[in-house]
Amino acid sequence: MSDTILALLGFATVIAVIVLLLRNVTVPALAFVSVSTITAAILVATGAFTLDEMAGFIKEGVKGVHGTAVLFIFSVLFFGVMTDAGMFDKIIGALMKKVGNNVVGVALMTCLIAVIGHLDGGGASTFLITIPAMLPVYKRLHMRRETLLLICVTAMGVMNLMPWGGPTMRAASVIEMEPNDLWFQLMPMQIVGLVLAVGTAIFWGLQEKKRIAKLGDAIVAEDAGKYDDSDDGKKDEALARPQNFIFNVILTLAVIIVLVLDIFPSYYVFMVGCALGILVNYRGKKLHSSIIKSHASAGLSMASTILCAGVFLGVLSKSGIMEKMAVVMASFIPTSLGRFLPIIIGILSVPLALLFDTDSYFYGLLPVLVSVGNQFGVNPAHIAIAMVVCRNCATFISPVAPATYLGIGLAGVEIKDHIKYCFGWQWGVSIVCLVAGLILGVIHF
């Protein structure tokens, strides 16, 4: 099977999964594993890969996401225990006193927490810091969960440009440049991005304010019909432990600090946090078992999606098919447009984020585009900057990014709704950043 045919099969696989997700044909886990299995069967049947090779690709793919899956299970359990114990009730009460019914203030607070939380460059830890803290406030004010995610992913996309962030380091390594040097060059675009992140919070905060004012009491019924609040509805007051509030706050802060310091694997931090939280707040094996079971369904549902996404990534990414997809895409760029390569790839970066995982995008597509750009005298750094800045805007709405599923799982939003709600806005933000880069002289053509 030729490289072009392999690439076309890869595109067909990705498009099939996206269509199944957006049309709500089935749950994400089944979409990932069924389509990936069909593709794997075709690859083995045509002799492109042996059965052993394909098994190895799938194993590597699942291995690459299993940490995120375990992290999700125990993070859901940890924050569930803290919610049962009543810790968030007091925190929410304090926040509500500060902001009252100031919807715009809540949106800005979300942006601030996401920006600070993403200083470590970790998408999972930022979602774990921001969403559990802000989601109860959004529910109390009847703000949409999709808006919470939109504000989060906008701020996170901008902060993901730090030199210790994965995308910047990957791009710098490909063009053989120091990450700090690349970051200094793109910093003006990041500053514009931060302004846009704050603007996003203000704009969508005002939109939520108008929506709530317009619908009035009817909004309660609308939210009840749209969201399943069975996981956080009427809590069992018998599980509340107000006397342990200080301990629970200290434990939560300790978990977050250790996460940011990156001393231990994130999932292990939450395992220990769960153990301490359950043992200190509750007594008896029966109660421990009951609490774990009450939160198991949410954790296992999303963990299964993440693991099945690992199968998808294994079949396409570990096999090298995504790299072949990148080569085919680059071959369609007309020679007459070669010098405009940074602009072209900048405009297309958000849609491409839905097709390529981070490694394939930077290690597969970037080297090919740099080679093409060299033929037209295009500075490799300008191509890298356009790809890093514009692509980051869509990192956390991509169905091939494991952290995306952690975020939507914590917020209780379907992947199709998340993409539909955020895609247009994130694409707009990326184009504004690109235009700013051109105006400020960060990118030349």
Could you describe each region identified by the protein language model?
Residues 1-14, 38-42, 47, 184, ...:
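Long, contiguous bundles of hydrophobic transmembrane helices that form the permeation core
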Residues 4-8, 63-69, 95-109, 140-148, ...:
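Membrane-interfacial loop-to-helix junctions in multi-pass transporters
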Residues 17-25, 79, 113-122, 153-159, ...:
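Transmembrane alpha-helix interface/packing and boundary motifs in multi-pass membrane proteins
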Residues 30, 55-89, 107, 115, ...:
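Core transmembrane alpha-helical segments of multi-pass membrane transporters/permeases
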Residues 71-74, 100-133, 332-376, 380, ...:
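Hydrophobic alpha-helical transmembrane segments of multi-pass integral membrane proteins
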Residues 90-92, 124-137, 165-177, 325-327, ...:
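Re-entrant/interfacial helical elements at transmembrane boundaries that shape
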Residues 136-223, 239, 379, 403-445:
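Membrane-core helix-loop-helix motifs of multi-pass transport proteins
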Residues 250-355:
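Transmembrane helical segments that form the transport core of multi-pass membrane transport proteins
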